Amino acid sequence: MKTGKELKPGTVIRLENDPWLVQKAEFTKSGRNSAIMKTKLKNLLTGYKTEIVYSADDKLDDVILDRKEATLSFISGDTYTFMDTTDYTMYELNAEDIESVLPFVEEGMTDVCEAVFFEDRLVSVELPTTIVRQVDYTEGSARGDTSGKVMKPAKLKNGTELSVADFIEIGDMIEIDTREGGSYKGRAK
């Protein structure tokens, strides 16, 4: 059992016998009212999304999920096929099932992902916390105002845009933190 105040993005709870993924959780406490947790939830079986407000003391059922290591095998249209690294079983997911990690999934990636199963059905895929990607396009370095942390826009091979340090050039390999939508960490070593 979890309480409402323990909810955070990535937590899975059971509502009406279905697993629901917490995509966003915002804790609010006002002086007059009790503390509340505003959440955005996604049904892992149907893809339906909703917003629910919980009291900090509400009791919620945990969901036990199975996890296996998998790698991206290939992409066909909006279907992403992942392969279990131990028994080589293939699993398919639609783009909408993995929309939170989609900006960092690209053909030919070698990252070992975590395939998430609910009752023997693949419902989601989680990327490692840090991934390495190649910068496909970025502007040249800015001259002059270089005191402090200077950032500029860059584009990855799959079209994802993010801000990188000013010294990063086209073709450089960068590290990306995949939590909370992904952010530049530094040049890959």
From Swiss-Prot:
It is found in: Cytoplasm. InterPro entries: Elong-fact-P_C, NA-bd_OB-fold, Rib_uL2_dom2, Transl_elong_fac_P/YeiP, Transl_elong_KOW-like, Transl_elong_P/YeiP_cen, Transl_elongation_fac_P, Translation_prot_SH3-like_sf. GO terms for cellular component: cytoplasm. It comes from the Bacteria. Pfam families: EFP, EFP_N, Elong-fact-P_C. GO terms for biological process: peptide biosynthetic process. Involved in peptide bond synthesis. Stimulates efficient translation and peptide-bond synthesis on native or reconstituted 70S ribosomes in vitro. Probably functions indirectly by altering the affinity of the ribosome for aminoacyl-tRNA, thus increasing their reactivity as acceptors for peptidyl transferase. Belongs to the elongation factor P family. This is Elongation factor P. It comes from Pseudomonas savastanoi pv. phaseolicola (strain 1448A / Race 6) (Pseudomonas syringae pv. phaseolicola (strain 1448A / Race 6)).
